[in-house]
A protein has these predicted regions:
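Hydrophobic/aromatic-enriched cytosolic interaction surfaces used to assemble or bind macromolecules
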Residues: 1-277
């Protein structure tokens, strides 16, 4: 499965049978698509954006309009936005929009774009995050008001599901795109999530251990489960094992096999988005 920089070679005859999941950041649009009818239809690609942090909307518009594939009449479109301007607050607090907005402003001083409140199932928490100015209206116009979530939500919900029947203290580390997404669970309950930019394996180890120590997990008895980029995992795991006894791979969602063998090669968060109805 090649990760191409465009969508020219993708030929879909019946888009009304297909589901599209997009993860959008300042550098690229990563996406998966699969058919509810065709076997082994799953595909994963990335399309680079010609722009940067200070000019995000126009490159995104160009990317979508330059790739007619994105404008097909899909059965379903879902979007995850990468945003580092976010807070995580209790679900009941997030249910009050005014209160959620005040909490965000307390953290960041002002709202510079569109604020989105993303309730996470099974976590007892919500991510309140900012979409860059103009991005949310563009997505709503182009994809007919798709669900737009934070890039951390899918993995938080998935790992929360894995912990719900336990009283485990556990850390999950998901490696992708030079990032480490770290989630923490205490007594089987969601406690913390953050996304860290990592320029080296040492960065990943530092952020993982910092969260581990902050939440006082036991290095001899508690688990650290790791997912994501294979090469990054192979470099990081031996380093983590110097400090934590139980470092093991996170369980891959078995349901992903139903949408195609290539699903195993796609990023975990996009797979999880693809599996959710």
């Amino acid at each position: 499965m090649d990760t191409l920089s465009n969508t020219i070679d993708i030929d879909i005859q019946h888009p009304e049978e297909w589901r599209l999941s997009l993860r959008i950041d300042e550098k690229c649009v990563s996406f998966t698509a699969h058919s509810d009818v065709e076997r082994e239809s799953f595909l994963f690609r990335k399309v680079e954006l010609d722009g940067g942090a200070n000019d995000f909307l126009r490159p995104l518009e160009n990317c979508i309009y330059d790739n007619p594939f994105f404008l097909l009449d899909f059965k379903q479109v879902k979007v995850a936005l990468h945003s580092m301007r976010y807070i995580i607050i209790p679900s009941d607090m997030a249910a009050d929009t005014e209160l959620a907005e005040r909490a965000f402003v307390t953290m960041y001083g002002a709202i510079g774009g569109n604020l989105i409140i993303d309730q996470m199932k099974g976590c007892g928490a919500a991510i309140v995050f900012e979409a860059a100015n103009g991005v949310l209206p563009f997505l709503n116009r182009t994809f007919n008001n798709p669900p737009v979530r934070h890039h951390l939500s899918a993995i938080c919900e998935y790992f929360a599901k894995k912990c719900e029947a336990t009283d485990a203290d556990r850390q999950y580390v998901y490696l992708h795109d030079n990032r480490a997404d770290v989630t923490m669970f205490r007594n089987g309950r969601f406690a913390f999530a953050n996304s860290f930019e990592c320029h080296s394996a040492a960065d990943t180890v530092f952020f993982a251990l910092d969260a581990w120590n902050e939440y006082e997990l036991d290095a001899l008895n508690d688990e650290l489960q790791i997912a994501g980029d294979k090469a990054a995992r192979e470099e990081v795991v031996p380093m983590l094992k110097k400090y934590i006894t139980y470092v093991m791979p996170a369980i891959f969602p078995a349901a992903a096999m139903k949408i195609g063998q290539d699903a195993m090669k796609a990023p975990l968060d996009l797979i999880l988005m693809s599996l959710c109805e």
